[in-house]
Swiss-Prot record:
Keywords: Antiport, Cell inner membrane, Cell membrane, Chloride, Ion transport, Membrane, Transmembrane, Transmembrane helix, Transport. The record marks 203 as: Mediates proton transfer from the protein to the inner aqueous phase. It catalyses: 2 chloride(in) + H(+)(out) = 2 chloride(out) + H(+)(in). Residues 1-32, 117-123, 167-176, 202-214, 282-287, 439-468 are cytoplasmic. Residues 70-76, 233-252, 310-329, 377-386 are periplasmic. The chain crosses the membrane at residues 33-69, 77-100, 124-141, 148-166, 215-232, 253-281, 288-309, 330-349, 355-376, 422-438. A motif (Selectivity filter part_2) lies at residues 146-150. This is H(+)/Cl(-) exchange transporter ClcA.
Length: 468
């Protein structure tokens, strides 16, 4: 608490207290202008954190590669050096999470949703550094994780930090700025401001308190974060790939079929994630040493995979252009799909600080392109472009697992600049959502939050017995 007070005083030291009070609130309720101004601050900071997090992860990955090529690779066998470097990087991520902020494990998005429901606390002074540096280690080791979950959680933590610095007491304002930070984080992760806004409005709809001021705050935060991202990284799309034209109307039924298949897989995939998480808990039994040893070994394994099968490692964003350029046969695509399903479950299920958006997009691309290539062979009468099915698959798997079809559609369009494919994306994503709902599947982040709350309750019940 003392450190937090020092932060507040240092920020506001040269601003008259009366001016702060007049700006932030009118009575006990913040003014609309002050909320939007704070949302702009949140978006700017979330954009900086998210953008430099991406830069930091790339720096770690490039440095790891350079070390293998030069100093360490010349002293030790290459395979051993790869295992040691990636294992050490993974250890950093697991240790920081376990020691300082257990809530920073995994994606972090369920934690923000829980905070919006006032059932999870946001220790921003711990979460931001732990997620940033822990994520650098985990993602830099080559594990199959995405950066969007960390940036959303760090963005939400930035929103809570700003409300604490400005001593905002109004619950609705604190809620709005928390959601604004999450939107800013996603906008900075994927250069996708529209998807970031819709993610809060659609995926977080059970927790989000709809009002004109809260919507405006989310929009402003996403815009500011995206401006920061583009100012630093440029205005190119995150994924470089061909620009496709809208497919023939006669082939639209294939997109519905593809969406249905993804609907089935999405339900199975979500259940497999829970099974993987429970399996890792059963393996290390919440013992710190066993947890760190398990994570370090897993990181070392992915260091080895980086040398021999790099397609099975990393978030997968870099793999997507190779897929859509037709560099792999159908059989290879299927094997890569199965392999990346396994590696995604291993990495995300282990509790490493990383997200699952990017790995899911890669999985959707793999299966979607394989489906499109197969359809092109079996239906020569139709003009089929497999790359279109790859893009549709990205949105469909996101929609089936996260249960946010509009967000998935916007995310894919913004990331690939393929605006002409909105119709097949809608058909595929809605088909996936409908099938997933019919099968009774739960949205992934609601499922993860429920599991976290359940495990916390069980630990609290066991605490008196252990103390006794």
């Amino acid at each position: 608490m003392i450190k937090r007070e020092r932060i507040v005083k240092s920020v506001l030291a040269h601003v008259p207290k009366d001016a702060i009070n007049q700006f932030v609130s009118r009575g006990s309720t913040p003014t609309s202008f002050s909320v939007l101004f704070m949302a702009a601050i949140v978006g700017t900071l979330a954009g900086l954190v998210g953008t430099y997090f991406e830069i930091a992860v790339h720096f770690v990955s490039e440095t790891r590669t350079e070390w293998l090529k030069s100093e360490i690779g010349s002293v030790l066998p290459l395979w051993l050096a790869a295992i040691l470097i990636s294992g050490a990087l993974a250890f950093i991520g697991y240790y920081l999470v376990n020691r300082f902020a257990p809530e920073a494990s995994g994606s972090g998005i369920p934690e923000i949703e829980g905070a919006m429901d006032n059932i999870r606390s946001v220790r921003w002074w711990r979460v931001i550094p732990v997620k940033f540096f822990g994520g650098m280690g985990a993602l830099g080791s080559g594990m199959v994780l995405g950066r969007e979950g960390p940036t959303v959680q760090m963005g939400g933590a930035v929103g809570r930090m700003v409300t604490d610095i400005f001593r905002v007491k109004d619950d609705d304002t604190r809620h709005s700025l928390l959601a604004s930070g999450a939107a800013g984080g996603l906008a900075a992760a994927f250069n996708a401001p529209l998807a970031a806004i819709m993610f809060v409005v659609e995926e977080m709809r059970p927790q989000f308190r709809y009002s004109l001021i809260s919507i405006r705050a989310v929009i402003i935060s996403a815009i500011m974060a995206n401006i920061v991202f583009r100012a630093i990284n440029g205005q190119e799309a995150v994924i470089t790939m061909p620009q496709y034209q809208s497919p023939e109307l006669q082939s639209l039924w294939l997109f519905l079929l593809l969406g249905s298949l993804f609907g089935v897989f999405g339900v199975v995939f979500n259940k497999l994630i829970t099974i993987a998480q429970d399996s890792f808990v059963a393996l290390h039994k919440n013992d710190r040493k066993r947890y760190l040893i398990t994570g370090t070994i897993l990181g070392g394994v992915f260091g080895l995979l980086l040398l021999y099968v790099p397609q099975l490692t990393g978030g997968g964003i870099g793999l997507i252009p190779d897929i859509t350029n037709g560099n792999y046969s159908i059989s290879i695509l299927v094997m890569l799909f199965v392999g990346r399903v396994i590696t995604t479950l291993l990495c995300f299920g282990s509790g490493a600080p990383g997200g699952i958006f990017a790995p899911m997009l890669a999985l959707g691309t793999l299966f979607g392109y394989a489906f499109g290539a197969s359809a092109d062979m079996l239906l020569p009468s139709l003009t089929i472009e497999p790359g279109v099915f790859a893009i549709a698959g990205m949105g469909a798997l996101f929609a089936a697992t996260v249960r946010a079809p509009i967000t998935g559609i916007l995310l894919v369009i913004e990331m690939t600049n393929n605006y002409y494919l909105i119709l097949p994306l809608i058909i595929t994503s809605l088909g996936a959502v409908i099938v997933a709902q019919l099968l009774g599947g739960q949205p992934i982040y609601s499922q993860l939050l429920h599991r976290t709350l359940k495990n916390d309750k069980l630990r609290q019940q066991d605490l008196p017995e252990n103390q006794a």
